[in-house]
C-alpha cells in the first residue's frame, strides 16, 4: 500500500497556478487544463486558471501600467489545448476584464488612500458588472466629432470597435488641456483703433509688438459705451444675417450682443456624450496660455515649461521702453521724481544680475512661468480682479474679473508690450514708483496696500476708482520676480437728497412728541 501511494504522489506534480474549482476547494491542482479533478466532476468548461490576487502596493496602479509578467499564466498548459478550452477560458473571465481588453470604460482610482481606492474600486466592479455603461467604448464617450460610432458597432466586440478604442486611448494619453486662445485668428485684429491715429500703418507693418512699444490710446466715445470695439465685428455678424429680398425682411439669427463679456458656457457643448459616472473633477479648469506671447503664460504643464523654455526673458528692453513712455506722457518735474525712485532700485538689479550666468537667467524664467501657472489655478477661483506684471512693469497675466472691471480684454493687453502704468492715472503712477522703490529692497514685508488707485478704461475720461493690494514675489536670488495686484472697486454712496433729509427730521420730531422726557 505504501508503494502505491508513493507512486501516485510521484505522478502528481504541483502547479503554481490552480484552477478556479480547485482553488475554491483548497485542493491540489495540476498544470494541465482541464485538470483530472474537474474531468471527474464534469467541470471541464469552467476549469481555467484562478486570477491572482493583486498585491497591496499595486492596488492603486492601473492595469495598463502593471509590469509584464515574465511567464504567462497559461504557459504550463501544454500545446494540446483545444479551441473549446480557449473559448471557455475567455468566456469565464469577468465582464470588467473583457471590456478593459477591448478599450472600454475602466474606473481608475482617484483617492490618495490605497485602502479607499481598493474599497471603492471593489464597489464599482460590483455595481457596474454586466451593465450597458461598461459596454460603451471609450471612442464614443471621448470622441470630439459630432458623428459618433453607430450603436451596432459600439456594443459589438468587432475589430473596428477595438481599433477605435485604441485610437481613443492614445488620444486620452495625451495632455487633455487644450489652448483656448490659440484657436483665435490674429491677435492684431483686436488692436484696431486702440493705438492712436497710426493704428492701421502699425498693424499693417511687420513690426514686432512685443519688442517695440506702442501705448494704448483710449477713444473718445459720444455715448460712453464700448460699441466702438464691435465695429470690426460688424462684417462677421452681417454674414450671419438672413435677408429675404422678395419681402424685404430680415430674420433673427444668433449674435453676440456683448463680446467683451466672457461666456462660461460656450465650451460646454463640445459634442461628446456625458455620463455622471465619468465626469471630471470640478477643480480641472481650462488653462489660458499662448506660446507665442513670450511675456505671458506660455505653456500649460510644468513639463513643457522645464523642457521648452531654453532662453531667458529680456527685461532691459522693457525698462528702456518704459522710460520712453514716461518721457512722452509726463512733464519734467514728474519725470525727475520718477527717475529718482527708479534710480534707487535699478542699479541694484544690474549689480545682482552681473554674477548670474545664462543658465541662471533661464532658470529664473522657468521659475516665473511655473509660479504663474500655479497662481492661475487659484486666481480663477477667488473671483477678485487680479493683474500680474513683471518687475519692469510689463503685464503678463490678468483674469476675467479684471477685464470686466476695466473694459480691456485679455488680447488687447497681452498681444503686445503693455505696462501697468498705462492703465493708471498720473497720481497713481507717481505713487506706484514710490511704493516700488520702497518695497523692492528696503522693506521685505512683500506687500503694500494703496487706499486709492484709479484705473483707466478704453473710453477716454472714464476711470475706475479702486483700492488695491500689491504683493511682491521674489525669486531664489532675492530679486523681485513678479507683482500680483488685486483691485477692488470703491462704490461711492450717493449723497442724501433734501427730501430725504426733511423726512428724517419729521420722523425725529414726531418721535420726540410721542415720548416726552
UniProtKB/Swiss-Prot annotation:
<dbReference type="GO" id="GO:0045013">
    <property type="term" value="P:carbon catabolite repression of transcription"/>
</dbReference>
<dbReference type="GO" id="GO:0003700">
    <property type="term" value="F:DNA-binding transcription factor activity"/>
</dbReference>
<dbReference type="InterPro" id="IPR000014">
    <property type="entry name" value="PAS"/>
</dbReference>
<dbReference type="GO" id="GO:0045991">
    <property type="term" value="P:carbon catabolite activation of transcription"/>
</dbReference>
<dbReference type="InterPro" id="IPR036864">
    <property type="entry name" value="Zn2-C6_fun-type_DNA-bd_sf"/>
</dbReference>
<dbReference type="GO" id="GO:0009267">
    <property type="term" value="P:cellular response to starvation"/>
</dbReference>
<keyword id="KW-0238">DNA-binding</keyword>
<dbReference type="GO" id="GO:0045944">
    <property type="term" value="P:positive regulation of transcription by RNA polymerase II"/>
</dbReference>
<dbReference type="GO" id="GO:0008270">
    <property type="term" value="F:zinc ion binding"/>
</dbReference>
<dbReference type="GO" id="GO:0000977">
    <property type="term" value="F:RNA polymerase II transcription regulatory region sequence-specific DNA binding"/>
</dbReference>
<keyword id="KW-0479">Metal-binding</keyword>
<dbReference type="InterPro" id="IPR056751">
    <property type="entry name" value="PAS_13"/>
</dbReference>
<comment type="function">
    <text>Transcription factor which regulates nonfermentable carbon utilization. Activator of gluconeogenetic genes.</text>
</comment>
<feature type="region of interest" description="Disordered">
    <location>
        <begin position="66"/>
        <end position="103"/>
    </location>
</feature>
<dbReference type="InterPro" id="IPR050335">
    <property type="entry name" value="ERT1_acuK_gluconeogen_tf"/>
</dbReference>
<dbReference type="GO" id="GO:0045722">
    <property type="term" value="P:positive regulation of gluconeogenesis"/>
</dbReference>
<dbReference type="InterPro" id="IPR001138">
    <property type="entry name" value="Zn2Cys6_DnaBD"/>
</dbReference>
<feature type="region of interest" description="Disordered">
    <location>
        <begin position="144"/>
        <end position="166"/>
    </location>
</feature>
<feature type="DNA-binding region" description="Zn(2)-C6 fungal-type">
    <location>
        <begin position="19"/>
        <end position="47"/>
    </location>
</feature>
<keyword id="KW-0010">Activator</keyword>
<keyword id="KW-0312">Gluconeogenesis</keyword>
<dbReference type="GO" id="GO:0001227">
    <property type="term" value="F:DNA-binding transcription repressor activity, RNA polymerase II-specific"/>
</dbReference>
<dbReference type="InterPro" id="IPR035965">
    <property type="entry name" value="PAS-like_dom_sf"/>
</dbReference>
<dbReference type="Pfam" id="PF00172">
    <property type="entry name" value="Zn_clus"/>
</dbReference>
<keyword id="KW-0804">Transcription</keyword>
<feature type="domain" description="PAS">
    <location>
        <begin position="371"/>
        <end position="443"/>
    </location>
</feature>
<keyword id="KW-0862">Zinc</keyword>
<dbReference type="Pfam" id="PF24990">
    <property type="entry name" value="PAS_13"/>
</dbReference>
<keyword id="KW-0539">Nucleus</keyword>
<keyword id="KW-0805">Transcription regulation</keyword>
<protein>
    <recommendedName>
        <fullName>Transcription activator of gluconeogenesis ERT1</fullName>
    </recommendedName>
</protein>
<comment type="similarity">
    <text>Belongs to the ERT1/acuK family.</text>
</comment>
<dbReference type="GO" id="GO:0005634">
    <property type="term" value="C:nucleus"/>
</dbReference>
<dbReference type="GO" id="GO:0006094">
    <property type="term" value="P:gluconeogenesis"/>
</dbReference>
